[in-house]
């Protein structure tokens, strides 16, 4: 599996803001938006392009645009925070949704929503979720995408745990990973260490509805 770690001073500074427990919801959202745009920029590096004629105020020339913009698929809830940054970089992208919550007792994903095109054959898919911990949620999402015909899937995560990266690599699913960092371990509650806490709670506040 191809893994790209975005090693850049601006990415590192935004990640530090997100890690800091003193950062409030608004500050966390702002840092996530900046870092999300950087990761989408890197994930888009190899997208196919096409040229077309364009006229500047001075002369005619050739412009460039994406040949086939990807579909952005956030894993709800925390993945929603990465949609606007992705669309700021690729405004003509479509958006699908996969909803999953974590069972706090088993640490396993509990799916509750799928809103995706029936056929993803030939489509490039960016699956976005701030955290890759055990890999359970992301593996479930990527399998859903692959079952609908997707063979070009990029997982975009802010922070990835080595355990989740290994699970993704060993799955055999058609996926590459773009991330800002790979953290070494998970704690007994399956939170990434050092990580940044619960990304959904830090984006939107505590979830008070059991799914």
From Swiss-Prot:
Binding site for 5-phospho-alpha-D-ribose 1-diphosphate: 77, 102, 129-137, 198
Cofactor: Mg(2+)
Pfam families found in the cross-reference section: UPRTase (PF14681)
Enzyme Commission number(s): 2.4.2.9
Coiled coil: none
One annotated GO biological process: uracil salvage
Regulation: Allosterically activated by GTP.
GO molecular function: GTP binding; magnesium ion binding; uracil phosphoribosyltransferase activity
Residues reported in the UniProt entry to bind uracil: 192, 197-199
Keyword terms, alphabetized: Allosteric enzyme, Glycosyltransferase, GTP-binding, Magnesium, Nucleotide-binding, Transferase
NCBIfam families: PRK00129.1, upp
Described function: Catalyzes the conversion of uracil and 5-phospho-alpha-D-ribose 1-diphosphate (PRPP) to UMP and diphosphate.
Protein name: Uracil phosphoribosyltransferase
């Amino acid at each position: 599996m191809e893994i790209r770690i975005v090693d850049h001073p601006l990415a590192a500074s935004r990640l530090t803001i997100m890690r800091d427990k003193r950062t409030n919801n608004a500050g966390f959202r702002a840092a996530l938006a900046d870092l999300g745009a950087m990761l989408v920029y890197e994930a888009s590096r190899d997208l196919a392009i096409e040229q077309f004629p364009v006229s500047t105020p001075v002369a005619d020339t050739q412009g460039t645009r994406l040949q086939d913009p990807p579909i952005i698929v956030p894993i709800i809830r925390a993945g929603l925070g990465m949609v606007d940054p992705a669309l700021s970089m690729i405004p003509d992208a479509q958006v699908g949704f996969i909803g999953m919550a974590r069972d706090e007792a088993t640490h396993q994903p509990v799916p509750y929503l799928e809103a995706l095109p029936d056929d993803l054959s030939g489509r490039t898919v960016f699956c976005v979720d701030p955290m890759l911990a055990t890999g359970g949620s992301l593996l479930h999402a990527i399998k859903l995408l692959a079952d609908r015909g997707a063979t070009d899937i990029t997982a975009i995560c802010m922070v990835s745990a080595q355990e989740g990266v290994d699970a993704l690599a060993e799955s055999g699913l058609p996926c590459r990973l773009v991330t800002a960092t790979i953290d070494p371990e998970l704690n007994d509650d399956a939170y990434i260490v050092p990580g940044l806490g619960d990304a959904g709670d830090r984006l939107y506040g505590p979830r008070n509805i059991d799914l």
